Amino acid sequence: MTAILERRESESLWGRFCNWITSTENRLYIGWFGVLMIPTLLTATSVFIIAFIAAPPVDIDGIREPVSGSLLYGNNIISGAIIPTSAAIGLHFYPIWEAASVDEWLYNGGPYELIVLHFLLGVACYMGREWELSFRLGMRPWIAVAYSAPVAAATAVFLIYPIGQGSFSDGMPLGISGTFNFMIVFQAEHNILMHPFHMLGVAGVFGSSLFSAMHGSLVTSSLIRETTENESANEGYRFGQEEETYNIVAAHGYFGRLIFQYASFNNSRSLHFFLAAWPVVGIWFTALGISTMAFNLNGFNFNQSVVDSQGRVINTWADIINRANLGMEVMHERNAHNFPLDLAAMEAPSVNG
């Protein structure tokens, strides 16, 4: 009888825990995805802060030339970064217990792999938590779908690209100048500016900025005034009010006359779907482009293929970009190799005389 009562009490505790985890009455919704999200993001954040402040230099290229990234080793907020895991480790799973000592783990850039893997797991769980909360509230799942765009982008640069290139040392450093270095090297090695998916991503980001500004300014300019001239128009809004807060007919008419009639939405729902879908699809394409270039399916490289009727080369901006890429690649990892791969693969010119 005692054993039966204890089991029932245990089940009751588990049931109360389940109800608390999945309750939508909590100030912050936890959910089953949150059970995994909270420890992974806390771990990633804690290790990032500690490593950014005090991590020793990392032998990123595997040639015994460690690179400093922390504040205590001479960097500032702009130049500091979490240096990626050493090329000597490659794609190996490298937890602390796989190293001979903590010093070795730090020297080989173990914190980077720890942070990145916990971060990716955490943001994926955050996306799942968004879906879970939407489901329990009876909402549609599009919030989680929209969030999948930055999750896909982060996964592309932190996981897919290193897998394609064969080493976590090719991942994006976790810092401001390190991010810029990653972008420059990526352009040099993959010609991303000439990749159609990157172009779609640029259209998504810049286009969504334009559309967001246009929508916000149109709504703000066509508010239904509920206050006097001496009060802010914003004071006329009550949270949860059933009435429209702005005149969509006026906004539609203004924009239709400014450009042309069918450039303006007359359906608020389709308008907001468009505002959400445009940047999400653009960033999806960018993430897909990074993932394809990870396996060296690179951007267009015309290689002086534009010629006139006589076969003479017509120089284009694409050729200028190619020359810039070679210059950037020469400067990249200059102590790890003598020549960029594009130059080293060519035959040596013949010398007469």
From Swiss-Prot:
One GO cellular component, as annotated: photosystem II
Domain of life: Eukaryota
Broadest EC class assigned to this enzyme: oxidoreductase
Site (Cleavage): A344, A345
Note accompanying the cofactor annotation: The D1/D2 heterodimer binds P680, chlorophylls that are the primary electron donor of PSII, and subsequent electron acceptors. It shares a non-heme iron and each subunit binds pheophytin, quinone, additional chlorophylls, carotenoids and lipids. D1 provides most of the ligands for the Mn4-Ca-O5 cluster of the oxygen-evolving complex (OEC). There is also a Cl(-1) ion associated with D1 and D2, which is required for oxygen evolution. The PSII complex binds additional chlorophylls, carotenoids and specific lipids.
Residues reported in the UniProt entry to bind a quinone: H215, S264, F265
Topology with respect to the bilayer: Multi-pass membrane protein
Subunit structure: PSII is composed of 1 copy each of membrane proteins PsbA, PsbB, PsbC, PsbD, PsbE, PsbF, PsbH, PsbI, PsbJ, PsbK, PsbL, PsbM, PsbT, PsbX, PsbY, PsbZ, Psb30/Ycf12, at least 3 peripheral proteins of the oxygen-evolving complex and a large number of cofactors. It forms dimeric complexes.
Similarity comment: Belongs to the reaction center PufL/M/PsbA/D family.
The protein's name in its UniProt record: Photosystem II protein D1
Organism: Vigna unguiculata (Cowpea)
